Amino acid sequence: LECAQIGEVTDTGRLEYFRHGQKVADIPAFSLVLGGGAPVYDREYTRPAYMDEIKPYDPPAPADTELVSIAHRIMNSPNIASKRWVYEQYDHTVRTGNTNTNDPSDATIVRLKDTDKSLAVTVDCNSAYVHADPYIGAMIAVSEAARNIRCSGGIPLGVTNCLNFGNPYNPEVYYQFVHAIKGMGEACRKYGTPVTGGNVSFYNQSVLKDRTEPVFPTPTIGMVGLVEK
């Protein structure tokens, strides 16, 4: 990958900035780290009531005579049916770096020209899992991404994220956010995949009749891995 060296790591615990050889800034790194010296919001949050309501859910097993019709309904649902008709319209040969074909693949493989290495890239999240349990659901999202990388022959290297939630001033929504972050962090530590960046999108909600409904919590995980020849 093309890159430019912009500095070096030291053991001073400080960030020093230089311009034309002259030091122009000297800042304690601790003061810039969330959870360290940087300000952190400490909002009120409460466990959503629906989590206790859905926990004991145990749907009855369908009768044998209903299995075929149930399978048809499931496979016809836009949430379940294949999305190939959408993503296969993209020209995957752009810039001649993508080694994938239209065959099923757990991750996209992008070759690094002039090397014997490639990158495996995947994006994953099942918001229904996160809605049911934000902590475990976020761990599942990271785990799915790691599996996709490994099943494509790669070694997981790092993570970025796109965190989509409702109104953070809603204590139940903020609970989802807090516990999804904790679950994501726990899984990333397990896989040794640092979170190099990401973004947070709040206030994703819709007004339905007389109530405001937030979207399902969706901490989308983007993971990259290294595939060696």
Name the predicted role of every residue range:
Residues 1-229:
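Glycine/proline-enriched, intrinsically flexible loops and inter-domain linkers
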